[in-house]
UniProtKB/Swiss-Prot annotation:
Stated name of the protein: Profilin-3
Keyword Phosphoprotein: yes
Localization (cell): Cytoplasm, Cytoskeleton
An example Gene Ontology molecular-function term: actin monomer binding
Amino acid sequence: MSWQAYVDDHLMCDIEGHEGHRLTAAAIVGHDGSVWAQSATFPQFKPEEMNGTMTDFNEPGHLAPTGLHLGGTKYMVIQGEAGAVIRGKKGSGGITIKKTGQALVFGIYEEPVTPGQCNMVVERLGDYLLEQGL
């Protein structure tokens, strides 16, 4: 399966039990900041934004004072899982980022999608990739 198919079929799909509800944007990005696949709506990010995200995975709490920035949008960092998941909130939407051995899985949402639904979609694919050694 291509990386784009993972984004299209596993991240940008309808959320189980909620037809028509899906993430706003999604991507799979290598630890080096190279985009493996992304939705058409995924924001263009700056290298320093990706560097800050990777630093937070290695040094949990790094982004807490400044927030998580992606494509010029600032998200308030909320509880995640140190070294594994970063979660951010902005207004009625937010972001979930799951770290795998080689990549970061991004999901961005707006209402009516809930934070829990975004977490489920992103973390399920991230866990699968981890199981595959990726």
